[in-house]
C-alpha cells in the first residue's frame, strides 16, 4: 500500500499513557478524516489486553508516547467511504490488532496479512503517512474497511470485544492444526487466563477432550465445573506430570511468564505439537531430548487474518462462545491495570465507553 497524505482534523476524546509509569489519563487527539476506503466507528467497548499494560509501561522498549492503547474494539459504523460496499451506517463491527498491511506480498495475497512484514498496528504503530496510530481507548475510530469485521447479532458487543484479539489468537492454531471440524483429539491448554479460558471453550465446542495445565491448584474447580474441561493437571506436581506423559495430541501454551517447555513437551504423544501464543520476555528454555525422542513439534502463532477473524466470530455466534468479562468505565482503567498485573481478573476487562459498569459471568 503506497504512502498517502492524510488529513487529521477529527478531534477525539480518549485515554493515554504519557510515560513509563503506565498511568492512563484523559487525552484529546486528532484522527484522520474518513477516506474513500474507511469507515468511522463509534466505539462502544474496548477490551484490555495484557499487551496494553506492557506497551503503556514500555516493557518492550517500543512505545511512542503518548500512547492510546486498545485493539479489541467493538462499535457502530457512523460514516462509510465511497469505495466501501460491505459495510453500512449502523452496522455492528469490530477492529482487532491490525490497521493495515501492504496487500501485495505473498502473505497478504494468501489472506495471511497478519504475517505481512509491513503490517500496521492499531495502536503504537507508524501509519503509511507517518502518523502514530491510536487505539480503542477512545470514543471514535477510523479504520480501513479491509481491517474491519462484522459482529454477528447474537454476540453481545461487550463480550465480543476480546474475541478480536484473544479469541482469534486461540482459534487460529486450532484451525491451522486441523482441529476445527475434526473432533476427538486430546488437547492441552497451558494457563487459564484471558486466552486459556477461551481455549477451553473452543476445544469443547469442537468436540475435543480438553485438559487444563496450570500452576494454580485453585483453578481446578473453575476449569472443570464451570468451563467444562475434562481434566486438570497441576504442573508443579511431578507425580501428576509423570502420570500424563505421552497423553496429549496438541498443546496451546498461553503463558507469558518465563517457563521451561521441557516438562510440557513430555506430555505430548509421539508426533504431538505444542503451539506458543504467549510471549515470554526471555529466551525459552528446553532440552532437545523431549523434542527429538517424541518427534514433536514446537510452533508459534500470532493473532489471525481478517478472513479468519470473521470466521472465528461466526463460529462463536454458532456455538455461543463468549469471553468472560468484567466491564469498567474509563476512569477505572488504572485500577484494572493494577489488577491485571496481579492476574486478578476473570478473565478480561472491557472498557464501556458510554459508562454504565456491569459485570458479566
Predicted features and spans:
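NAD(P)H dinucleotide-binding glycine-rich loop of Rossmann-like/cofactor-binding domains
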Residues: 102-190
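Adenosine-nucleotide cofactor-binding segment
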Residues: 183-192, 200-263
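Helix-to-beta-strand junctions that scaffold the AdoMet/dcAdoMet cofactor pocket
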Residues: 268-269
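Short N-terminal strand-loop motif that marks the start
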Residues: 1-74, 139-145, 354-361
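C-terminal hydrophobic helical "lid"/dimerization subdomain
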Residues: 1-10, 212, 217, 306-361
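Rossmann-fold NAD(P)-binding glycine/threonine-rich loop
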Residues: 278-295, 306-314
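Glycine-rich beta-strand-centered segment in the early N-terminal region that forms part
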Residues: 30-46, 59-109, 150-154, 214
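Glycine-rich Rossmann-fold phosphate-binding loop(s) that bind the pyrophosphate
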Residues: 166, 191-195, 279
Amino acid at each position: 500500500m503506497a504512502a498517502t497524505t492524510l488529513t487529521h482534523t477529527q478531534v477525539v476524546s480518549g485515554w493515554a499513557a504519557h510515560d513509563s509509569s503506565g498511568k492512563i489519563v484523559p487525552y484529546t487527539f486528532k484522527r484522520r478524516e474518513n477516506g474513500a476506503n474507511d469507515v468511522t466507528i463509534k466505539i462502544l467497548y474496548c477490551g484490555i489486553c495484557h499487551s496494553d499494560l506492557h506497551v503503556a509501561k514500555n516493557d518492550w522498549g517500543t512505545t511512542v508516547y503518548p500512547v492510546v492503547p486498545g485493539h479489541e474494539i467493538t462499535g457502530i459504523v457512523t460514516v462509510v467511504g465511497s469505495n466501501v460496499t460491505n459495510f453500512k451506517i449502523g452496522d455492528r463491527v469490530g477492529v482487532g490488532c491490525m490497521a493495515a498491511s501492504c496487500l501485495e506480498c505473498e502473505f497478504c495475497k494468501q489472506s495471511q496479512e497478519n504475517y505481512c512484514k509491513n503490517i500496521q498496528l492499531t495502536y503504537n504503530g507508524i501509519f503509511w503517512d507517518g502518523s502514530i496510530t491510536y487505539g480503542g481507548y477512545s470514543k471514535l475510530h477510523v479504520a480501513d474497511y479491509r481491517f474491519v469485521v462484522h459482529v454477528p447479532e447474537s454476540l453481545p458487543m461487550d463480550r465480543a470485544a476480546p474475541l478480536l484479539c484473544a479469541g482469534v489468537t486461540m482459534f487460529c492454531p486450532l484451525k491451522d492444526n486441523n482441529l476445527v471440524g475434526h473432533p476427538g483429539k486430546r488437547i492441552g491448554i497451558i494457563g487459564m487466563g484471558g486466552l486459556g479460558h477461551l481455549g477451553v471453550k473452543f476445544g469443547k465446542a469442537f468436540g475435543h477432550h480438553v485438559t487444563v495445565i496450570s500452576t494454580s491448584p485453585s483453578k481446578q474447580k473453575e476449569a472443570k465445573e464451570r468451563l467444562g474441561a475434562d481434566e486438570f493437571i497441576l504442573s508443579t506436581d511431578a507425580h501428576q506430570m509423570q502420570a500424563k506423559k505421552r497423553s496429549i495430541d496438541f498443546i496451546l501454551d498461553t503463558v507469558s511468564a518465563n517457563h521451561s517447555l521441557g516438562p510440557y513437551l513430555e506430555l505430548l504423544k509421539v508426533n504431538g505439537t505444542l503451539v506458543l501464543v504467549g510471549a515470554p520476555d526471555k529466551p525459552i528454555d528446553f532440552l532437545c531430548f523431549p523434542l527429538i525422542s517424541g518427534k514433536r513439534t514446537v510452533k508459534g502463532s500470532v493473532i489471525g487474518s481478517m478472513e479468519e477473524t470473521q470466521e472465528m466470530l461466526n463460529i462463536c455466534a454458532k456455538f455461543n462462545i463468549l469471553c468472560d468479562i468484567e466491564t469498567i468505565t474509563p476512569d477505572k482503567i488504572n485500577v484494572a491495570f493494577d489488577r491485571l498485573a496481579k492476574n486478578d481478573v476473570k478473565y478480561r476487562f472491557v472498557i464501556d465507553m458510554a459508562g454504565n459498569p456491569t459485570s458479566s459471568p
